[in-house]
């Protein structure tokens, strides 16, 4: 029966990904050129913006919005996904993860700027995302509802099953904890957080992400430094394998590219339409500011966290064997001793659980787009908890396959939409660039963009940043 479901999922997934990679890279390159290599020219600017506070210290700050999206990004894709990519696609998959991220940073700027532009008020806070800019920018509420359903099901349900599946595997491998016990504990913790709303999501995200990411990066640096003589050889292997000069595992260069793209997109979410839901929550003076913040998020996720995992694994073996997290655990055990599996299990628990929390919020804001209803929201919360339990107990491969399918559908819709709305995002960017050239801290007003409609949040003379 499971093989039947695997086939049912893999056939449409393979078809979508066959073409999605070219759209992903093509649009990323288009945005990169159209916006003048914005992800490189404004790289330092991103760090300036990330520390800004909202006026009067009300609402969600730029950094808090960054942590919400980072909570979703920094999870299984960074540890399990990278290991899976290397095991199935070889070292070259890492190179294509870098390529997808580099061009995807421009896509992330566009989608997150649009999310800020078309956000709506929610009490003292804001909410928004692709569903909102599809309705307001394209006038297609029906498509917004389709996207809202997709992201609610995929992130709140499917992707959370992926996260808890990895948690259960890591805890079983390190401590031999019964998966039923893991499922119960995760269900209780998840319920406590998600019934607390946005404030509790923010609190958990900004606590877990910086601490665990910092520790993980330091360990990766230690591994690289202590294996510095082997490091140039690893880089050479990555490039040679990526370009087809050196085959390490079975399959051609096309397979390596697709595997790298899939795992990279699952981790950094550039162009997928997920991070814009976090970007919309921030109180900022200009929509482009969150575009830059989420662009930085893609860099942080792929070039820092994912790359750390890749080097940890490849300095251990260029042909690792095993499923996901077990590969990373074995590599760390080789580098830093017997306590490594314990560390990686705890790190995986915290990273993945923060992703569960961030993923939940993406679903919540889209439930509210479809219909503001406490009943439907509570039904969704119960469904999230049920999928947390399911993921803890289910098989490994079918969960990843379901994630790949839903991720592909979401990305396809969002990429088409942001391509159609890219001219609007470009005008917003030019407004920001003009003010920065004048030495100003940019403040956006909708009237500065002729013909701009449905950006009600930015129509006031004085913006509440």
Curated annotation (Swiss-Prot):
Keywords: Amino-acid transport, Cell membrane, Ion transport, Membrane, Sodium, Sodium transport, Symport, Transmembrane, Transmembrane helix, Transport. One of its GO terms (molecular function) is amino acid:sodium symporter activity. It is a multi-pass membrane protein. The chain crosses the membrane at residues 20-40, 82-102, 142-162, 177-197, 208-228, 241-261, 296-316, 336-356, 382-402, 405-425. InterPro entries: Na/Ala_symport (IPR001463). Gene3D superfamilies: Amino acid/polyamine transporter I. Its main location: membrane. GO terms for cellular component: plasma membrane. Induction: Negatively regulated by TnrA under nitrogen-limited conditions. It is found in: Cell membrane. PANTHER family: AGSS FAMILY TRANSPORTER, SODIUM-ALANINE, AMINO-ACID CARRIER PROTEIN ALST. Belongs to the alanine or glycine:cation symporter (AGCS) (TC 2.A.25) family. This is Amino-acid carrier protein AlsT. The lineage of its organism: Bacteria, Bacillati, Bacillota, Bacilli, Bacillales. The gene is alsT.
């Amino acid at each position: 029966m499971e093989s039947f479901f695997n086939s049912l999922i893999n056939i449409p997934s393979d078809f979508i990904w066959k073409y999605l990679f070219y759209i992903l890279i093509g649009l990323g390159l288009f945005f990169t050129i159209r916006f003048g290599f914005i992800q490189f020219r404004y790289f330092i600017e991103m760090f300036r913006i990330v520390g800004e506070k909202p006026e009067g210290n009300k609402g969600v700050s730029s950094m808090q919005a960054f942590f919400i999206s980072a909570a979703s990004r920094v999870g299984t894709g960074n540890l399990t996904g990278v290991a899976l990519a290397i095991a199935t696609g070889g070292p070259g998959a890492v190179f294509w993860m870098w390529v997808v991220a580099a061009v995807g940073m421009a896509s992330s700027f566009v989608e997150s700027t649009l999310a800020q532009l078309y956000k709506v008020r929610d009490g003292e806070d804001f909410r928004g995302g692709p569903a909102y800019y599809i309705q307001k920018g394209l006038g297609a509420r029906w498509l917004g509802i389709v996207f809202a359903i997709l992201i609610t099901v995929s992130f709140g349900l499917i992707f959370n099953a992926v996260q808890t599946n990895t948690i259960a595997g890591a805890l079983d491998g390190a401590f031999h904890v019964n998966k039923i016990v893991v499922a119960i504990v995760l269900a209780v913790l998840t319920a406590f957080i998600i019934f607390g709303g946005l404030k509790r999501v923010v609190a958990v995200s900004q606590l877990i992400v910086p601490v665990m990411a910092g520790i993980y990066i330091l360990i990766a640096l230690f591994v690289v430094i202590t294996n510095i003589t082997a490091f140039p050889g690893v880089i050479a292997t990555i490039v040679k394998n990526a370009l087809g000069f050196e085959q390490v595992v079975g399959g051609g260069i096309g397979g390596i590219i697709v595997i790298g793209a899939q795992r990279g997109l699952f981790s950094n979410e550039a162009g997928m339409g997920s991070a814009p839901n976090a970007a919309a929550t921030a109180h900022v003076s200009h929509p482009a500011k969150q575009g830059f913040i989420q662009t930085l998020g893609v860099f942080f996720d792929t070039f820092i966290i994912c790359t750390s995992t890749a080097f940890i694994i490849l300095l251990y073996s260029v042909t690792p064997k095993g499923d996901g997290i077990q590969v990373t655990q074995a590599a760390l055990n080789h580098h830093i001793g017997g306590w490594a599996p314990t560390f990686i299990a705890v790190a995986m628990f915290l990273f993945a659980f923060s992703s569960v929390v961030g993923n939940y919020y993406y679903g919540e804001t889209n439930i509210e787009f479809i219909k503001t209803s406490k009943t439907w929201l509570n039904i969704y919360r119960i469904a999230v908890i049920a999928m947390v339990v399911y993921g803890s107990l289910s098989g490994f491969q079918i969960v990843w396959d379901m994630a790949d399918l839903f991720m592909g559908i979401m990305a396809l819709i969002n990429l088409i939409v942001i391509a159609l709305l890219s001219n609007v995002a470009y005008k917003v960017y030019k407004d920001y660039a003009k003010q920065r050239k004048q030495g100003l801290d940019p403040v956006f007003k909708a009237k500065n963009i002729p013909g701009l409609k449905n950006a009600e949040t930015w129509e006031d003379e004085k913006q509440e940043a």
